[in-house]
Amino acid sequence: MAEARIDIFKKMINDDPNNTTIRFGLANELLKLERFEEAANELKVYLSQTDDQGNAYGKLAQTLERLGRVEEAREAYQQGIIAANRHGHPGMAQDFEMALDDLI
């Protein structure tokens, strides 16, 4: 069932590659299946296409952590802090700061 949803999202992205809502949905479906490398790639494309409020940076950072890419995760958290503060989400920024402190 989840694979079918991923196939549908991929077809929709193929038809409309600049639709950030669809791309974010695909990334979330990939995360559910623990397909972290693919999810990270989709999140990076998503972030290059839109002014995210911070949530996607957090998802990307956590995904990169799971992949053992700590420096990239650190950068994603830092970008997430900037985005969260810019969009008036100090609680999210604080969560990312704590996650940064916990990175090895």
Predicted region positions:
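Structural marker of alpha-solenoid helical repeat scaffolds
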Residues: D15, Q49, A83-H87
